[in-house]
Amino acid sequence: MATLSVQPNEAVTFAVAYEHEDVGVIEKRAGLVTQPGKGHEDDTLLNGLFARWGNQLQQLGADRDYGLLHRLDRETSGLLVIALRGKAYDALRKQFESREVRKFYWAICLKKPRTDTGVIDRPIAESTPKKLGEKKLARISGSGKAAQTAYRVLEATKKGCLIEARPLTGRLHQVRVHFDSIGSPILGDGLYAPGPIAAAAPRLALHAHRLGFTHPVTGEAVDIKSKFPKDLRGVLVKLGLKRPDAESE
């Protein structure tokens, strides 16, 4: 067996929502860093992926990010697509670049936006404040890169609202920064929201619940969905909101 570049760690668990010899879709739990870095050398999602698909990911190599095509913030839970072969990675990378991959998030926000549906079109720039060390922050800035997030309000009460967001671009912390910029910060966001809003949920109330793409080899449409996360269901109850996936059970 070839030496693996990333240390496999079977203790890092994740759910497999879809698996094919060329591609997999997994569900990342909140609190899990996507890939190794300072302070997280062997306890990341990628370490767990290597425990399951180490040989395939090793063959892809660092040039193909060991199969990683996109990432989720540490605090965010939800679906990620993983390439298991080079041909699949290259084809899916093109789909991401041409914005053909469809990603949908559920976000529990402080209040309802002015319109029930819309597209937030505000450029985003990155910075690295000294007080946060190497951690990057995103902000709305005219000098930033183009960023668009489509959204629709699923339900709203006087206490809060549930929104489905579809990022059309892939900027750092895009959904979080965009909703904060229109006065609808996501509950539990300890990075961008004031204290009371950050404390209103056990963690960032953001979940990547649906992922759609064209299978890179068969050409078939793949549309994967996940359930509303258990650790955020109590927040919905407190706000008087219904689970968006309740009818599927």
Where are these regions (language model features)?
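RNA pseudouridine synthases
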Residues: 1-249
